[in-house]
Swiss-Prot record:
It comes from Mycolicibacterium gilvum (strain PYR-GCK). Keywords: ATP-binding, Coenzyme A biosynthesis, Cytoplasm, Kinase, Nucleotide-binding, Transferase. It is found in: Cytoplasm. Pfam families: PRK. InterPro entries: P-loop_NTPase (IPR027417), PanK (IPR004566), PRK/URK (IPR006083). This is Pantothenate kinase. It comes from the Bacteria.
Length: 312
């Protein structure tokens, strides 16, 4: 592991150093399962799961146990009853990063691996897309052109949801977003029932502010990182694949893109990237990277080659 010459709260690893921390953690994920978890354009394989994600799952597993011991100590100090071992305080993980960087795949792989530990089998994954304001509300607020930026989210609703989960409520409900419709699905909810671990994945989950923010409730956080130029290329490549896939569905909000030529599609994707996604990354998402417990740094081929762990 690399230690910076100046005092630092971080410790950096190359992949070989990190994989040694897997110890004897077994791989319980099959190739078929990984295919279903892999996002569009992602190239994660079982070797990367073994060398990157298993050590990460082991670290989180250890931190879950330590966090529960801390809660028990606090309860003892307050003279409160010890928590029910069958209903521990949920451990909340935030996963952040740019559009097209692969954070959704990271979140899904983590969910699959963590759920295989017998001490925390109930692992739920929620994306913050469901907390975007509906298109009608965004239009009313004149924010459609800012969709995905922090102000386009119901941040109070998101905070209430995570607080409800973390406080041990029997049920918490999250709105559901449809990428096909490009809007919130009216009346549809994702039901969360006292999980052992909650993974919250989204662009802006690590944001801070003058008031309590959802990031203040995280027990662990991951930022998926890459060069901006690489993410742009991945976004354009994904756009071209979606033009032939999801966009081809007549019900898709983006169906009009399905008839574009390659040249037209690349132009459209690059325009969206530079007018929306790149500014959001630079202004809002990238500045939150130092807050992450762990930064996963990707190379141009999508492989994770370096990691930075916050130790303080």
């Amino acid at each position: 592991m690399a230690r910076l010459s100046e005092p630092s709260p971080y410790v950096e690893f190359d992949r070989a150093q990190w994989r040694a921390l897997r110890m004897s953690t077994p791989l319980k994920l099959t190739e078929d399962e990984l295919v279903r978890l892999r996002g569009i354009g992602e190239k994660i394989d079982l070797l990367e799961v073994e060398e990157v994600y298993l050590p990460l799952a082991r670290l989180i597993h250890l931190q879950v146990a330590a966090r529960q011991a801390l809660f028990a100590t606090t309860a003892d100090f307050l003279g409160e009853p010890q928590q029910n071992p069958d209903r521990p305080v949920p451990f909340v993980i935030g996963v952040a990063g740019s559009v097209a960087v692969g954070k959704s795949t990271t979140a899904r792989v983590l969910q699959a691996l963590l759920a295989r530990w017998e001490h925390h089998p109930r692992v739920d994954l929620v994306t913050t897309d469901g907390f975007l304001y509906s298109n009608s509300e965004l239009s009313r607020r004149n924010l459609m052109h800012r969709k995905g930026f922090p102000e386009s989210y119901d941040r109070r609703g998101l905070m209430r949801f995570v607080t409800t989960v973390k406080s041990g409520s029997d049920v918490a409900c999250a709105p559901v977003y449809s990428h096909l419709l490009y809007d919130i699905v009216p009346g549809e909810k994702q039901i969360i029932e006292h999980p052992d671990i909650l993974i919250l994945e989204g662009l802006n989950v690590l944001q801070t502010g003058p008031a309590l923010m959802v990031s203040d409730l995280f027990d662990f956080s991951v930022y998926v990182d890459a060069r901006i130029e690489d993410i742009e290329n991945w976004y354009i490549s994904r756009f071209l694949k979606m033009r032939e896939g999801a966009f081809a569905d007549p019900a898709s909000h983006f169906h009009h893109y399905s008839t574009l030529t390659d040249e037209q599609a690349v132009f459209a994707a690059r325009d969206i990237w530079h007018s929306i996604n790149r500014p959001n990354l630079i202004e809002n998402i990238l500045p939150t990277r130092p807050r992450a417990t762990l930064v996963l740094r990707k190379d141009s081929d999508h492989s994770i080659n370096r990691l930075r762990l916050r130790k303080l």
